[in-house]
Amino acid sequence: MLEKTIYYKMITLKVKNIIKEKLPLKSGDKIIVGVSGGADSIALLHILTELNLDLQLIAIYIDHGLRPDEIPQEISFVKGQAGAVGAEFESISVDVLALKNCDKLSTEDAARRLRYQAFAEARERYGAKYIMVAHNADDQVEEFFIRLLRGSGRRGLSGMPYQNGLLLRPLLSLTKADLLLYLQERGIDHCEDSSNREPCYLRNRIRLDLLPRLEEYNPSLRRTILNTSSILESEEDFLEKSARELFNRSTRINREGKLPKTELDCRSFSGGHQALQRRVIELICWQMDAQPSFTHIENICRLATEGTSAKTLQLGSGLRVKKEISQVVFHYPLGRIATRQGEREIRLERRIDGEGIFAIPELNRQLTISTGEGAGEGRLLVDREKINFPLLLRFHRAGEKFHPLGAPGRKKVSRFLTDKKVHGEDKQLYPVLINGDGNIIAIVGLAIAAQFKKTETSKQLISIGWQETTT
């Protein structure tokens, strides 16, 4: 009995030391704790109460809607365990299958996304400082193989960190066996999730099939993988710092114009190792809310080191990457477009059948057509009697002309935009609105054609609005 008592106290002490060395917890912190009812999370809940840190714990149970026969019992159990340690409790339901079908995700990925979203919302709602989950050393090994099979690089294979922003994992140095022994010695029960035995989930197949097979070749496989992850983590830290240094030397933010641009100096960039170059490109894209694929990163690296001036690449998010003499420019000439369809050309041809508000996601804008003078900055007014629906909103064509109101005669649309200090690809932010008879009514957001102007004899007006939308 003495050995058992010493062992469970050793586990608690080990977690306390991890928190002291690796996590930013302070006495009195309010913490969201993810508690499923399984051995890991129940052990975490009880260990946290034994640390004498005066933590304010909120136990959050996530009902994924996948095991309706087991959920009520688990909720009741977790609520009781939370009450036993003086923690608040809340059960949150999420619709995993709806997200899975909508976004074409696996069940595991949809559940993970909704789970962490629910934790984040709970943290805001309770005013908590951190979110804590019960990932352990066995989870770390399984995650290594999941990421390996998905093609992760060094960063992914270095494993889950003890801290990732506001997310804390204090049990990563403990095995599943450690936690089960802790519960056994403390006389604490836990729930068994039947889905952990279902072979339809990748993590289960790795745990139940792949790992036992590999352990026939190396009985110390799990320790070997953890050591490898630790080595990769240290090397990852070094590479990340080196990439940051190259990033700082070779990039700058240009805030001139309507949208900020990131400019990459090709000479400074080309002096870096290829491994660092890839990281710099990835970092630029992530900071600009784009998720680059490996192919995107390779193409942009070649553009910076070998590409000719004026060559352009475009990511599906709307991020455009262009070589301009000695630099590569990353920007959103058309606003942030929430798609992930790979590199593509943006086209615009929108039929407008009458009054209304029309979302133009291609440009992150909305067009408003309404009777009367309307309200809002940048509204253009035209004579209603001269408007023939349906209208057409599209990009201007090469050489296309119109007669701007107030100008002595016709002018090329492109030249007019240049005179208005709208240059290059930014010109696509101002498409033309075409009347039913084929004439240009307006360059939306900027100017109307003279023949559509309001006069003293105008009986009714049409207001044309052009606003940026939020994403």
Swiss-Prot record:
Q: What InterPro entries does the record tag this protein with? A: Lysidine-tRNA-synth_C, Rossmann-like_a/b/a_fold, TilS/TtcA_N, tRNA_Ile_lys_synt, tRNA_Ile_lys_synt_N, tRNA_Ile_lys_synt_subst-bd
**In which compartments does the protein localize?**
Cytoplasm
Annotated catalysed reactions = cytidine(34) in tRNA(Ile2) + L-lysine + ATP = lysidine(34) in tRNA(Ile2) + AMP + diphosphate + H(+)
Q: Which UniProt keywords apply?
A: ATP-binding, Cytoplasm, Ligase, Nucleotide-binding, tRNA processing
Its predominant location is: cytoplasm
Q: Look up the record and report any one GO term of the cellular component aspect.
A: cytoplasm
Nucleus among keywords: no
The processes (GO biological process) annotated in the record are: tRNA modification
The record lists ATP as bound by 36-41
Read off the CDD domains from this record.
Answer: TilS_N
List, alphabetically, the Gene3D superfamilies matched: 1.20.59.20, HUPs
A GO MF term: ATP binding
Which Pfam families does its entry note? ATP_bind_3 (PF01171), TilS (PF09179), TilS_C (PF11734)
Cysteines joined through disulfide linkages: none
Give the EC number(s) listed in the UniProt record: 6.3.4.19
Give the protein's biological function.
Ligates lysine onto the cytidine present at position 34 of the AUA codon-specific tRNA(Ile) that contains the anticodon CAU, in an ATP-dependent manner. Cytidine is converted to lysidine, thus changing the amino acid specificity of the tRNA from methionine to isoleucine.
Q: Which family does it belong to?
A: Belongs to the tRNA(Ile)-lysidine synthase family.
Q: What is known of its domains?
A: The N-terminal region contains the highly conserved SGGXDS motif, predicted to be a P-loop motif involved in ATP binding.
Protein name according to UniProt: tRNA(Ile)-lysidine synthase
What gene name is given for the protein in this entry? tilS
